């Protein structure tokens, strides 16, 4: 039976990879809805190729632009805009599968709506779990939704784990691998002068700018530890992080009998996306087969928390619980945006997040509204801290 997809965040890197897989298997997948924020021209191209019933954008001006271009091309796609439209296409009867690939907190509400509608959810949006893990997982369980992780690390763990709960599968711990990003071998003192372009040059993966910066700070890996806690039901002390520069082993599961299972593959997001789309079957993802003889060597090392303070902050937030993870995520989003706009330096990202976590009193959220309130409060605090921060050094010439 053909799956009908709502693709949240279709113009980003995950969206591109998803549509590449979809195009390879038109007999298996069709597109009900595509969404973007303001990249209207790219969304128009996607709509003309995949003919969704609905397209959603962030604001009225972009909607008018997209609608005019689609009408001129003879498309019958309905164009909507705004947060409620994202929620509507995520819970619509027109789709059975929702690919949640919106970056940031904006993706939380539609992901939660998909869970409450009992959809099959291919989760690439970290914030649904980082900000409101208990609420989201309760919705998945209570409404019979199916959660399939798309992040390469969580997808790898999913493939290596038994289908039963972790506590009944003889699992000792799970190990998330990390490339270490572009600054793995840089001395911490030299990171003060890092530029946005340097931070976005990931050695192995092709990603958007925000997630590339998160990879450079290793905040991305910290958020993935929090995600893994909620997806697989393991406490933080049974989730390890291991730097693996080649990005060939995507994660590992260690069992009590001494066995360790790992999932390997070329660093291409089409592999985990294709696995999740076709699960429990496997389909061609358009990815080259892994040649271990050509790679020749796989290496590993423990993370250096002095070089990557954001990783330590994320682990601390998971340990503290309450709204700490939501505050961590919100402060990081604000700080990364400021860094990309050259308003703060690279090391100020961690300093901003740390200051917010130390300022905002932790509490147990009563519900989604409380989580969103904590998110807003953390963003306000982060903006205030950044406004008072010294300007970064002038970018050097290379």
Curated annotation (Swiss-Prot):
Top EC group: oxidoreductase
Binding site for Mn(2+): 151, 153, 224
Pathway where this protein functions: Isoprenoid biosynthesis; isopentenyl diphosphate biosynthesis via DXP pathway; isopentenyl diphosphate from 1-deoxy-D-xylulose 5-phosphate: step 1/6
Keyword NAD belongs to the record: no
Organism: Burkholderia lata (strain ATCC 17760 / DSM 23089 / LMG 22485 / NCIMB 9086 / R18194 / 383)
GO molecular function, one term: manganese ion binding
Binding site for 1-deoxy-D-xylulose 5-phosphate: 126, 152-153, 179, 202, 215, 220-221, 224
Record keywords: Isoprene biosynthesis, Manganese, Metal-binding, NADP, Oxidoreductase
InterPro entries: DXP_reductoisomerase, DXP_reductoisomerase_C, DXP_reductoisomerase_N, DXPR_C, DXPR_C_sf, NAD(P)-bd_dom_sf
EC number of the protein: 1.1.1.267
Family statement drawn from the similarity comment of this UniProt entry: Belongs to the DXR family.
Needed co-factor(s): Mg(2+); Mn(2+)
Catalyzed chemical reaction(s): 2-C-methyl-D-erythritol 4-phosphate + NADP(+) = 1-deoxy-D-xylulose 5-phosphate + NADPH + H(+)
Functional summary from the UniProt entry: Catalyzes the NADPH-dependent rearrangement and reduction of 1-deoxy-D-xylulose-5-phosphate (DXP) to 2-C-methyl-D-erythritol 4-phosphate (MEP).
The protein, known as: 1-deoxy-D-xylulose 5-phosphate reductoisomerase
Keyword check for Metal-binding: yes
GO biological process per UniProt: isopentenyl diphosphate biosynthetic process, methylerythritol 4-phosphate pathway involved in terpenoid biosynthetic process
Alphabetized Pfam families for the sequence: DXP_redisom_C, DXP_reductoisom, DXPR_C
Domain of life: Bacteria
Ligand binding (NADPH): 11-14, 38-39, 125, 127, 208
């Amino acid at each position: 039976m053909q799956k009908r997809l709502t693709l949240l965040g279709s113009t980003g890197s995950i969206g591109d990879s998803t549509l590449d897989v979809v195009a390879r298997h038109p007999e298996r997948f069709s597109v009900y809805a595509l969404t973007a924020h303001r990249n209207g021209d790219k969304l128009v191209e996607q709509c003309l190729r995949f003919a969704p019933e609905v397209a959603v954008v962030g604001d009225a001006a972009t909607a008018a632009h997209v609608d005019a271009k689609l009408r001129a091309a003879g498309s019958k796609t309905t164009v909507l805009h705004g947060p409620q439209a994202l929620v509507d296409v995520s819970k619509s009867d027109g789709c059975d599968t929702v690919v949640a690939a919106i970056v940031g907190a904006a993706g939380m509400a539609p992901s939660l709506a998909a869970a409450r509608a009992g959809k099959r959810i291919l989760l690439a949006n970290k914030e649904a779990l980082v900000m409101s893990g208990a609420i989201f997982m309760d919705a998945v369980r209570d409404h019979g939704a199916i959660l399939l992780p798309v992040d390469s690390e969580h997808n790898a763990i999913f493939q290596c784990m038994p289908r039963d709960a972790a506590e009944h599968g003889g699992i000792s711990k799970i190990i998330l691998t990390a490339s270490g990003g572009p600054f793995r071998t840089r001395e911490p003192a030299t990171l003060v002068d890092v530029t946005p372009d340097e931070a976005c040059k990931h050695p192995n993966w092709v990603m958007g700018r925000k997630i590339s910066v998160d990879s450079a700070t290793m905040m991305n890996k910290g958020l993935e530890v929090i995600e893994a806690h909620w997806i697989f039901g393991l406490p933080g002390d049974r989730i390890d992080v291991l730097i693996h520069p080649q990005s060939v082993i995507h994660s590992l599961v260690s069992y009590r009998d001494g066995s360790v299972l790992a999932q390997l593959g070329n660093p291409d997001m089409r592999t985990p996306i294709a696995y999740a789309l076709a699960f429990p079957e496997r389909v061609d993802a358009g990815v080259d087969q892994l040649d271990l003889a050509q790679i020749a060597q796989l290496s590993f090392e423990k993370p250096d928390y002095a070089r990557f303070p954001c990783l330590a902050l994320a682990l601390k937030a998971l340990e503290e619980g309450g709204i700490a993870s939501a505050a961590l995520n919100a402060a990081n989003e604000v700080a990364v945006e400021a860094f990309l706009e050259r308003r703060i330096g690279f090391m100020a990202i961690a300093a901003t997040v740390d200051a917010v976590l130390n300022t905002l009193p932790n509490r147990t959220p009563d519900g989604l509204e409380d989580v969103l309130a904590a998110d807003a409060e953390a963003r306000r605090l982060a903006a205030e801290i950044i406004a008072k921060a010294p300007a970064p050094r002038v970018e050097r010439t290379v």
